[in-house]
Amino acid sequence: MLKQAKKKGKPVIYHTHTTYEDFRGSIKGSYVLSPIIKFWTKKLYNEADYLISPSEYTKNLIKSKYLEKDKEIRVISNGVNINKFNKNEVLKEKFLNEYKLVYDINKPLIITAGLPFERKGIKDFVKVAQECSDYQFLWFGSSSVKSMLPDKIQKIIENPPKNLIFPGYVDKDILIGAFSAAKAFLFMTYEENEGIVVLEALSAKLPLVVRDIPVYEDWLEDGKTCFKARTNEEFCQKIRNIVENNVENLDEITETAYNIAVERDLLNIGKKYKEYYEHILNQKNR
């Protein structure tokens, strides 16, 4: 398809959402397969005329480790639907009614979402749940991949601590209800190209606790738009500060963070794509 497009004089654009770094620590054999992933992504990214990355971090990663010669890379966020991901009292009650027989809904709720990969920090998430045993933890994410996960991760999902539940994939209304009921969103990933669930948490004005990794350096600020941690002890402390109201300006932090989601609303992202595609076509017609 790439060669056919080039023969017809059509510009080829690739989205750099797949990287060697992002693939490791996912499914069974990912550490063995990741060099193959890097070989093919490197080949394809070099053959493309234009590249689009979801973050400055990914852009710099592609430039430094994948491209053989300099190439234009435009950064355009994955985006978030801010009209869908906002706190909703009706959906909150729906969620609590559905889960009141599953866990003690009087406990402070800490949530996360995403595929339960090792790279996503699932082992540390379990340790934090054990340390903060007076809180309830939920990890939302497709359970259909369970058989593809390493045995050690499958065992975690099958035998979690009493205060941790893996509901798997849930209806969007239930998920938004959980966002509305939770005290914090805990995202302990070790590697990310942006993190759509991060944008969803910001959009819902849910206090966000993330691992202090390079992808968040230039757009999430500790104590201003989120809370960053490096160790499990730090994660526990950040969560406790939020739950126990030991953060004086928490509302201000979530409001400032919400502005990031507004900037990355899908309507704005659509405009950016339109502008960039028009720019590419203008370049072609010169």
Where are these regions (language model features)?
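Short, structured helix-loop element that forms part of the nucleotide-activated donor/catalytic region
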Residues: 136-163, 174
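Carbohydrate-associated surface elements
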Residues: 57, 79
